[in-house]
Amino acid sequence: MEKLSFEEGKFAVKFARINIECYLSGVHYVVDDLPPIFKKPRGVFTTLYTYPKRNLRGCIGIPEPVMPLIDALKEASISASVDDPRFPPVGRMELRDITIEISILTPPKLVEANSPADYLEKIKVGRDGLIIEYGTYRGLLLPQVPIEHNWDIGEYLANLCLKAGLPVDTWIKKKVNIYSFESQIFKELSPNGKIVEEK
């Protein structure tokens, strides 16, 4: 799948910040001159962190490529700031103390597994984001999450189950579907500051 250039990634982060600022101020934000890739369907997540402590402040996204990237980014950035049920809505002044991280996702693919041991072989920590599905339960973790928490593959899968509201060993004991995806990550180093691509 086509990757974003660094300039396109910077555009995504800047767009997310301005979009959130406008939403919190009651102003409608419209962009006329879009890079072509933003008109293509892509999955995307917006993650907000406090600065400088880098505590999670909100994270919501659209994992499937069901709408143009610009629309997914618009929806995910606003939702991360006001709709994450784990946190109160971000205040307009608070945004000055928040950094923004954008993850552009590849389409999720089913990890083919005949036994739970296959997951340990096929999933790579740091490369793969994961989605687990079991009945009506569903959970997602971005590829950067196990790196930030220093999890091994077993801990990653256990926490994926927890994210879905399932017991930690569900991936071993039940017939689950696990999907993997990769992401391209662009983030601010400080609020409204320098933007880098995480490699």
Swiss-Prot record:
It comes from Methanococcus aeolicus (strain ATCC BAA-1280 / DSM 17508 / OCM 812 / Nankai-3). Residues 7-197 form the AMMECR1 domain. InterPro entries: AMMECR1 (IPR023473), AMMECR1_dom_sf (IPR036071), AMMECR1_domain (IPR002733), AMMECR1_N (IPR027485), AmmeMemoSam_A (IPR027623), Uncharacterised_MJ0810 (IPR023472). Disulfide bonds: none annotated. This is Protein Maeo_0138.
